[in-house]
């Protein structure tokens, strides 16, 4: 995720440095904002995951069955997040597309393009996160049924 954000930030920098048209110039700040979101999210997720690994290891060593039950409850809670994130991603993407065709100014066209990028990025991330959650939950359930 952070790598994708860095690529967007690089695009923003390149447009700032060499973009000559009004549309290129107005994309700089919206792309900068859209690029910072996955960079910050990716870095903070990596830091928090590394901290949780130590905690998870000690929880696993203390009581494996309780750890699995806790993980099952945590992963099942992801469905609540996806109920809201999928529609938000779709609304951002479609809203950006509609806005792009309704407005004429380069700034609003740039904002609408960045809305579409943000929406697609959110949908792609959530799609793969949901897939991983399903696989993880299946493994947890298999492990719990072994006992």
Predicted regions and their residues:
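Short, amphipathic, aromatic/basic-enriched membrane-interface segments that mark the entry/exit
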Residues: 1, 79-86
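Alpha-helical transmembrane segments of integral membrane proteins
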Residues: 26-30, 84, 110-114
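Hydrophobic alpha-helical membrane-associated segments
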Residues: 41-44, 48, 121, 125
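Short membrane-interface loop/juxtamembrane segments of multi-pass integral membrane proteins
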Residues: 60-82
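Alpha-helical transmembrane segments and their immediate juxtamembrane interface regions
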Residues: 108-145
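Long, highly hydrophobic alpha-helical transmembrane signal-anchor segments
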Residues: 1-39, 88-105
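Membrane-water interface of transmembrane alpha-helices
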Residues: 43-62
């Amino acid at each position: 995720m952070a790598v994708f954000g860095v690529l967007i930030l690089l695009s923003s920098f390149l447009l700032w440095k060499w973009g000559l048209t009004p549309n290129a110039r107005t994309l700089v700040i919206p792309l900068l904002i859209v690029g910072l979101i996955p960079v910050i999210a990716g870095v903070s997720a990596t830091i928090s995951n590394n901290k949780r690994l130590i905690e998870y290891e000690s929880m696993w060593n203390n009581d494996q069955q309780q750890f699995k039950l806790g993980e099952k409850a945590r992963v099942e809670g992801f469905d609540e997040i996806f109920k809201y994130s999928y529609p938000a991603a779709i609304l951002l993407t479609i809203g950006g597309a509609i806005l792009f065709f309704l407005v004429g100014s380069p700034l609003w066209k740039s904002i609408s393009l960045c809305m579409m990028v943000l929406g697609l990025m959110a949908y792609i991330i959530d799609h793969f996160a949901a897939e991983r959650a399903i696989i993880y939950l299946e493994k947890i359930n298999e492990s719990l049924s072994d006992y």
